[in-house]
Amino acid sequence: MPTKIPRNDYAAMYGPTTGDRVRLADTDLIIEVERDLTTYGEEVKFGGGKVIRDGMGQSQVTRAQCAVDTVITNALIVDHSGIYKADVGLKDGRIHKIGKAGNPDTQPNVDIIIGPGTEAIAGEGRILTAGGFDAHIHFICPQQIEDSLHSGITTMLGGGTGPAHGTLATTCTPGPWHIGRMLQSLDAFPMNFGLSCKGNASQPEALVEMVSAGACAMKLHEDWGTTPGAIDCCLSVADEMDVQVMIHTDTLNESGFVENTLAAIGDRTIHAFHTEGAGGGHAPDIMKVVGYENILPSSTNPTMPYTVNTLEEHLDMLMVCHHLDKSIPEDVAFAESRIRKETIAAEDILHDMGAFSVMASDSQAMGRVGEVIIRTWQTADKMKKQRGRLAEETGDNDNARVMRYIAKYTINPALVHGMSREIGSIEEGKRADLVLWSPAFFGVKPEMSLIGGTIVMAQMGDPNASIPTPQPVYSRPMFGAFGRAVERSAVLFVSEAAQAAGIGDQLGLAKDTLAVKSTRDIRKSDMIHNSFRPDIHVDPETYDVRANGELLTCEPATDLPLAQRYFMY
């Protein structure tokens, strides 16, 4: 007969349920469970004396009869689509079903069948998110990949060939030969990848050649000459070949001002990198592009959030990244023109308003590859403390703000780059690129990461201990990060032209290749929870930023969550 148990006891046993609230790490962000897809009294849980046993929560159904490969039980899902509790069934490396797991022979309402061939991951008291997507990578060194993976990222997009000086400054893998070598190298790592080629050319032939060789995007960078002619040529090729274009505009305004760049772009879709400007772009008013429907604005993480240390560290970073010389006054003036506290402060607020749509790193080129997720949540926390609740919030929680910020490094970059049918959210049919977090470590240190349904990284104690938990516990690569499992779990994103030409066979790639699609009809209004288009004015003398006439300014943070408390060693 049914019985009731205290809510605290239930949460301790099966995780939080509808109406329960959870704090995210040491931030002031509180989420509330909106709904629970499991069935009270019929929850499945693995362990001695628990439910997932033969004839109880485990059925006799074979894999061929639709039992799942893996079940994640009682997970608290935090996604752009909502904050809710469910069991998640994985099969063939994809999310098979989100709902209620168990044995249909003994339990009601079961839509995820647990069989003898099903592995169990305990999601009770854990948060489940889609793997993060960092869409601004300088492939300067392969060690970045490990740092990124261990922070909760499962997909990286960018360009480069290693520590060549072109790569140190620009996210471009130039030419078919380099693209081929990089794709062959990236075959070896437990991470999904896409490469961007150089987009700076005034004639289309070389750009077509690079996209056909496997690049899934093109990058226009001022260090290669982002002139109106190059912008027009690059976008014309992109429209023809269905790949995205990322742009780093002309800081010095040598070949034109922001208005000239906007005229060259026209109404064509483009992904605007570090749209605040410290990372590069028309000084001082590149930020005005956030108001355009065809421009998809992103930030890189060194300016996020604005703190008392932000300005001081940026000048030296910029000199190194762009191969500048402190003994040349013009180089110093170039660097100083990009670092403006007024626009950096406004960037925080525009993210909170949903005007900036994407967060990325700019790895080792004025950005930290392992801090995309950390800095996203630090910004959300800073904005809650400084600006209060969002008008969109309902109830005593921060669900709307949390969904806005998680979209910035999951679904929105996937939409921008034509990958959203495969990655970016927890949806049935998408790849099982998933990250499990303890709420106390949310945003800082993932408990476990899966790519294509295979565990590639997890917190693990001393391997020589009698149990997995003795210290030192830290994130370590798991079986999915080794051998042939890497090849079958992660993928390489390429252009449709390269996919049709059989680029995988041409280069002898072991990973599957997937073509990006529908990159040219994405608009700002498609950016989930981040589609606000204010009219931006930047004062050319004071650098004050106004959105729809409202002055945007905030104080720099003097301390942040998700910081030294979590990194004592």
Swiss-Prot record:
EC category: hydrolase
GO terms assigned for molecular function: nickel cation binding; urease activity
Catalytic site: 322 (proton donor)
Subcellular localization, as worded in the UniProt entry: Cytoplasm
GO cellular component terms, A-Z: cytoplasm
Listed InterPro entries: Amidohydro-rel, Metal-dep_hydrolase_composite, Metal_Hydrolase, Urease_alpha_N_dom, Urease_alpha_subunit, Urease_AS, Urease_asu, Urease_asu_c
Cofactor field: Ni cation
Positions contributing to Ni(2+) 2 binding: 219, 248, 274
Span of domain Urease: 131-569
Enzyme Commission identifier(s): 3.5.1.5
Alphabetical list of Gene3D superfamilies matching this protein: Metal-dependent hydrolases (3.20.20.140), Urease, subunit C, domain 1 (2.30.40.10)
PTM remark: Carboxylation allows a single lysine to coordinate two nickel ions.
Listed name of the protein: Urease subunit alpha
Organism: Jannaschia sp. (strain CCS1)
